[in-house]
């Protein structure tokens, strides 16, 4: 298998963590989907990462679909549960975590536009989403080490990934001070091999002039 990613992408990281948890052999290909010479557009009509290329050359996207696929071909460890109640809870945490990442991405893209096109109001709107999303995660987590059903699953992959993405893209938000239980949660999971082996890194993208 081959996995096309952007180095800082939290969505790609979710897939990378899942692949490592399931011990599936794969090759990682790093791309910059925002740049003109990206190879991503040839693999996904939306021009987005991650993209999983299977041994039979099938292209699978986005992260949620890929991880569902991985759960089918390698059932253990199970990342999405079979029972409806727990699945709904996990999907809700995943949606909140992905929404936090979406807002961080939008701020990042706004900040790389030329100065006279940057909208402070747009950025403030995204910052509000991030804070409210973290507040929701904090309340839902409470004093637990896992979000749903006391075992590691897609909710934890999504939540942890979103916390570290906020760290690298939105450093001025001191979420650890604001939400100490999320900090404790981060410390509990930070040494997990699949997280330690998939730390995100920054990439340079072309300036946005429109």
Q: Model regions: which residues?
A:
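GST-like domain detector, emphasizing the conserved glutathione-binding G-site
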Residues: 1-121
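Aromatic-glycine hotspot motif
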Residues: 52, 64, 129, 133, ...
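Non-transmembrane alpha-helical segments in soluble domains
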Residues: 67, 71, 91-94, 134, ...
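Short, hydrophobic secondary-structure boundary micro-motifs
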Residues: 77-82, 146-150, 175, 196-201
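GST-like fold's C-terminal all-alpha helical module
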Residues: 97-187
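Long hydrophobic alpha-helical segments typical of transmembrane helices together
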Residues: 176-210
């Amino acid at each position: 298998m081959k996995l096309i990613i952007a180095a800082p992408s939290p969505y790609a990281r979710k897939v990378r963590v899942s692949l490592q948890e399931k011990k599936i052999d794969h090759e990682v290909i790093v791309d910059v989907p925002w740049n003109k010479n990206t190879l991503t557009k040839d693999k996904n009509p939306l021009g987005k990462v991650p993209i999983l290329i299977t041994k039979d050359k099938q292209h699978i996207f986005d992260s949620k679909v890929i991880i569902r696929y991985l759960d089918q071909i390698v059932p253990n460890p199970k990342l999405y549960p079979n029972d409806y109640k727990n699945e709904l809870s996990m999907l809700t945490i995943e949606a909140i975590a992905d929404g936090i990442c979406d807002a961080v991405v939008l701020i990042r893209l706004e900040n790389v536009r030329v100065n006279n096109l940057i909208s402070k109001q747009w950025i403030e709107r995204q910052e509000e989403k991030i804070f409210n999303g973290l507040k929701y995660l904090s309340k839902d987590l409470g004093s637990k080490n896992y979000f749903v059903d006391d075992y590691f699953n897609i909710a934890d992959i999504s939540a942890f990934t979103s916390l570290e993405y906020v760290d690298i893209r939105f450093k001025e938000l001191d979420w650890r001070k604001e939400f100490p239980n999320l900090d404790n949660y981060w410390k509990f999971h930070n040494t997990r091999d699949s997280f330690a082996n998939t730390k995100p890194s920054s990439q340079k993208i072309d300036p946005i002039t429109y």
